[in-house]
């Protein structure tokens, strides 16, 4: 949680109780690696532990593009999955016993996965939700989320700068504010319709306050995120439950690992396939690297706020959706026309300490270098976002040398688009790892 101060050193003991969460995380990761295939294991590792470094570039890009990247970042959603799994396994046991089992396990999971502000928020809210009935009190969500924020900031006020905290609390605030109003519309309807409406309204509620923050920090808004979450979130919850059980069983009895992995692996492949199909749709995402996209987002929020304030007109929200879609197409077309009809546009992309320069003319583009030394900057994603928002085709990539600050973004770039020609500089071996780039 962004702790500050002078570092201190003491004698280490790998078997100490304080390192139990790390040992559990390592054991779970090793068991996943032994029981699952490379692709499925990488996804499950990201889902259960938040460890995304093993994910294939294309899979990670697809999940991010369609609005499913939150399943790879352990958060309150995963705590809810775990609490639901424990409740299902315990059945109709006494409420006190469920509370005594669930709360410690949820907090242990939080420590295993790194105790980020978002997961700590969920642990506090789940604990309050389970303890309140035992004390004869009603669980009040606004009180729970406020108390969670107070505890986190009392421990470390600098946590307010955490993107994880900002997105988590804004998403839950949206769910508390909007979701009950939307689910009420399906009251008295068919059970299947109510379930679909609950999933839709929860996703929409989570987006209403968090979307501006996500667009500001990550520069992307997935237009198909409502659809992707409706199709995949229930499946992800099943994969989480079956995957966690399979890993625990495989850790105890390694011979059963491959068998226990069969069903979760099928679910993982289904989620990745759906993400790949949705990513291939045109206009599946908006990229906030131009003034047109920013103006469009402001316009969308303005018309929906106007609809909420009007309180009249049965079809006003349908009209707002239509206007939002029409204005999106208009903004995208106007932005693309600038690159289709103008002369040569030279764009130095902001990749921190590195180089990435786009040359765009008449809808065609060449990219000179694609890399950054800053670990938090994905040069390939930045280039791909700009090309898609410009509606340009990448014809060629030119590498002037092979150091990471000029070439480490290529994998992410080619996970999202291809280039017909790649020009490699014929220079000394000291100018980076050419063999690694060619691979």
Segments from the language model and where they lie:
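Aromatic-rich juxtamembrane segments at the membrane interface
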Residues: 1-123, 130, 396, 415
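Non-globular, low-confidence helical/coil segments that flank catalytic cores
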Residues: 16, 191-193, 248-439
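Stable alpha-helical elements in mature extracytoplasmic
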Residues: 24, 28, 39-43, 59, ...
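Conserved G/P- and acidic residue-centered "switch" motifs that form tight phosphate/ATP-binding loops
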Residues: 75, 210, 401
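Membrane-interfacial alpha-helical segments at the cytosolic side of multi-pass membrane proteins
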Residues: 76-96, 126-132, 172-182, 242-246, ...
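Membrane-helix interface "capping/anchor" motifs
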Residues: 90-99, 133-143, 310-316
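Central hydrophobic cores of alpha-helical transmembrane segments
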Residues: 101-107, 145-149, 318-327
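Internal transmembrane alpha-helical bundles of multi-pass membrane proteins
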Residues: 115-301
């Amino acid at each position: 949680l962004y702790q500050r101060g002078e570092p201190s050193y003491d004698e280490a003991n790998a078997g100490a109780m304080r390192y139990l969460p790390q040992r559990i995380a390592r054991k779970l990761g090793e068991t996943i690696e032994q029981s699952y295939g490379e692709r499925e294991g990488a996804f499950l590792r990201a889902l259960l532990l938040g460890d995304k470094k093993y994910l294939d570039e294309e899979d990670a890009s697809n999940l991010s593009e369609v609005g499913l990247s939150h399943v790879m970042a352990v958060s309150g959603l995963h705590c809810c999955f775990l609490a639901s799994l424990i409740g299902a396994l315990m059945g109709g046991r006494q409420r006190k016993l469920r509370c005594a089992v669930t709360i410690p396990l949820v907090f242990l999971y939080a420590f295993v996965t790194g105790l980020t502000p978002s997961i700590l928020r969920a642990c506090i809210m789940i604990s309050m939700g389970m303890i309140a009935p035992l004390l004869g009190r009603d669980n009040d969500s606004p009180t729970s989320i406020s108390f969670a924020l107070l505890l986190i900031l009392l421990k470390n006020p600098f946590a307010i700068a955490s993107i994880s905290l900002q997105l988590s609390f804004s998403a839950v605030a949206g769910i508390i504010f909007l979701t009950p109003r939307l689910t009420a519309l399906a009251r008295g309807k068919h059970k299947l319709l109510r379930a679909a409406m609950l999933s839709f309204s929860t996703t929409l509620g989570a987006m209403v306050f968090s979307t501006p923050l996500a667009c500001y920090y990550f520069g992307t808004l997935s237009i198909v995120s409502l659809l992707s979450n409706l199709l995949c979130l229930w499946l992800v919850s099943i994969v989480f439950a079956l995957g966690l059980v399979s890993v625990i069983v495989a850790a105890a009895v390694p011979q059963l690992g491959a068998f226990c992995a069969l069903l979760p692996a099928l679910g993982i492949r289904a989620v990745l396939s759906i993400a790949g199909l949705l990513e291939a749709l045109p206009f599946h995402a908006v990229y906030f690297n131009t003034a047109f996209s920013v103006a469009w987002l402001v316009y969308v929020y303005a018309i929906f706020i106007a609809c909420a304030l009007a309180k009249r007109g049965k079809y006003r929200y349908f009209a707002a959706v239509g206007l939002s879609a029409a204005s999106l197409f208009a903004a995208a077309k106007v932005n693309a026309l600038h690159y289709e009809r103008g002369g040569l546009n030279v764009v130095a992309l902001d990749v921190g300490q590195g180089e990435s320069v786009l040359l765009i003319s008449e809808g065609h583009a060449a990219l000179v270098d694609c890399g950054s030394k800053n670990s938090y900057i994905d040069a390939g994603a930045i280039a791909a976002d700009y090309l898609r928002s410009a509606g340009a085709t990448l014809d060629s990539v030119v590498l002037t040398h092979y150091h990471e600050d000029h070439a480490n973004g290529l994998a992410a770039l080619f996970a999202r688009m291809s280039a017909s020609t790649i020009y490699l500089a014929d220079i000394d071996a000291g100018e980076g790892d050419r063999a690694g780039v060619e691979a």
